[in-house]
């Protein structure tokens, strides 16, 4: 769903844990901002996965600004459904591989030399631009890491969700142990941890 915001009124409003309305504003300084909630969700997933900040270099564009920068006439940026992003310290190829994993059958993913374009269109589009935009079949390669229960316990310990990993690694958990662990994980997530 695309929502309309005012930079002056809503600029500092958080649309997700790590993104505010202002970050989606047109680079021409206009007040009106269109933002698709699915785009915000996608960007937050990317942010959570890499654990690195994301700079949105271009999101919503007014028609006048889009024409000024020679943007595509039917650009998803005009609809508030697209963002050009830089994930700090992560190569564009790694970002597009993860985006392909998240959106294998829909959405737009464009790989450029120093940024990535993502959009939440219902159809599927993939391209690269190294001087001239060209369509590609996709960006396969990302595989979700499968963790063992021991890996999961180590991760929870390293993130300071639990403080006695050996107790959890023993393998026989009571219902109360599981309930306590779920409460700890829920508290961690609700406090912004990922």
Q: What are the language-model segments listed below?
A:
Residues 30-40, 89-90, 143-147, 172, ...:
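Soluble non-cytosolic domains of exported or imported proteins
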Residues 44-70:
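Extended, low-complexity, intrinsically disordered C-terminal regulatory tails
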Residues 140-194:
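Short, solvent-exposed alpha-helical surface patches in non-cytosolic proteins
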Residues 61-65, 90-92, 166-171:
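Short, charged/polar surface micro-motifs in flexible loops or helix N-caps
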Residues 48-51, 90, 100, 104, ...:
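Sec-exported extracytoplasmic/periplasmic mature domains
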Residues 1-47, 113, 122:
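Extracytoplasmic cell-surface/polysaccharide-interacting catalytic and binding patches
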Residues 74-83, 87-144:
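Catalytic cores and adjacent binding grooves of peptidoglycan-active enzymes
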Residues 41-44, 48, 93, 97, ...:
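Solvent-exposed, polar/charged alpha-helical surfaces in well-ordered, non-transmembrane soluble domains
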